[in-house]
UniProtKB/Swiss-Prot annotation:
One of its GO terms (molecular function) is NADP+ binding. GO terms for cellular component: cytoplasm. This is N-acetyl-gamma-glutamyl-phosphate reductase. Catalyzes the NADPH-dependent reduction of N-acetyl-5-glutamyl phosphate to yield N-acetyl-L-glutamate 5-semialdehyde. It is an enzyme of class 1 (oxidoreductase). Belongs to the NAGSA dehydrogenase family. Type 1 subfamily. PROSITE patterns: ARGC. SMART domains: Semialdhyde_dh (SM00859).
């Protein structure tokens, strides 16, 4: 099968490309970029890949004629217009940006500060949280955000089994600098990041509304969450530490049972119990590892959720959606060995 990838120069696109190249069901990955005037060798755009495959100027008609699916690893605001030819043709689109994650256009406009995609397109978009949905027969798949993935996988058993007080959810999420994207800023400059930890976008991060939207799909009574984000002096990985109060009568055994049952057959979510996971054990893999503590004295449940933001939080989950859509094995093309040491 041939697939197209638009957006190879960003971190997410680079990692996705490397996984697509080794996928057993993919024979060819056609590369496109919106800013090119003519074909350009990939190694001129991304030297560390040592690959001279041509990257072509973006051409939707060429993709429709030659490929079976298209991946967009582009910034927010691109896909909502660039995807239109594919949607008209019922051609499979997997979008790694936030353009189709939110069902309410006004919510997108509020959080992304730009106009939303067409209402009709938002209605048919499929939110591809692969551990809780099936992308079979879907032609517009919105890949979840990295913070959203780590947070939702950590909260799902507690929300679905109605084990916690919904007004007490606190998420303290920390990420490596690759989560901020490739474009350098003053906050991602080495001298600012090194030997430092800095909060940013507290309660204003763009992933908050998609988290709340999915939580409400599991329990409509969810109203809001406290959500903070911290930039760490590491390259990759997310640690989301989640706190909530149990409902009266809920005990540790119920919480443990909920996590074990929810993820019993999930190939990429590993419940580690009270052995709290570290970022290092998942970087380079498509795993989400979840550790859980029940503090009876403080009457608080704590969940530690770790993922690689560029794999499970981006390209890896995109491939999971691709595998579902085209009936490949759930683990096809996905890495399971961490980058150690």
């Amino acid at each position: 099968m041939k697939v197209a990838l638009i957006g190879i120069t960003g971190y997410g696109g680079m990692v996705l490309y490397q996984m697509l190249k080794t996928h057993p069901g993919i024979d060819q990955v056609d590369l496109y970029a919106r800013h090119l005037a003519g074909p350009t060798p990939l190694n001129q755009l991304v030297p560390n890949l040592f690959d001279d495959q041509p990257v072509y100027p973006y051409d939707s008609q060429k993709i429709l004629a030659n490929d079976g699916a298209v991946f967009f690893a582009t910034p927010a605001g691109v896909t909502k217009t660039a995807a239109r030819p594919y949607l008209t043709a019922h051609f499979p689109v997997i979008d790694l940006s936030g353009d189709y994650r939110l069902k309410n256009g006004a919510t997108y406009e509020k959080w992304y500060h730009q106009s939303p995609a067409a209402t009709a397109d938002l209605k048919v978009a499929h939110y591809g949280l692969t551990d809780f949905c099936d992308a079979t027969d879907e032609n517009l798949i919105a890949n979840p955000g990295c913070y959203a993935t780590a947070t939702l996988l950590g909260l799902a058993p507690l929300i679905i089994d109605q084990l916690i007080d919904l007004d007490t959810i606190v998420v303290d999420a920390k990420s490596g600098t690759s989560g901020a994207g490739k474009k350098p800023t003053s906050s991602t400059h080495f001298t600012q990041v090194n030997e430092n930890a800095q909060l940013y976008n507290v309660n204003h991060h763009k992933h908050i509304p998609e988290i709340v939207q999915q939580l409400q799909a599991w329990d409509p009574a969810v109203d809001a969450i406290q959500f903070s984000t911290t930039l760490l002096p590491i390259t990759r990985g997310i640690l989301a530490t989640i706190y909530a109060k149990p409902k009266p009568g809920v005990n540790k055994d119920q919480v443990v049972a909920a996590f074990k049952q929810t993820y019993a057959t999930d190939p990429f979510v590993r419940y580690t119990g009270e052995n709290l996971p570290t970022i290092k054990q998942v970087v380079g893999t498509n795993y989400c590892d979840l550790g859980v503590l029940f503090n009876e004295r403080a009457n608080t449940i704590m969940v530690a959720s770790v993922i690689d933001n560029l794999i499970k939080g981006a390209g890896g989950q995109a491939i999971q959606n691709f595998n579902q859509r085209f009936n490949f094995a759930p683990t096809a093309g996905l890495p399971t060995a961490p980058l150690l040491p």
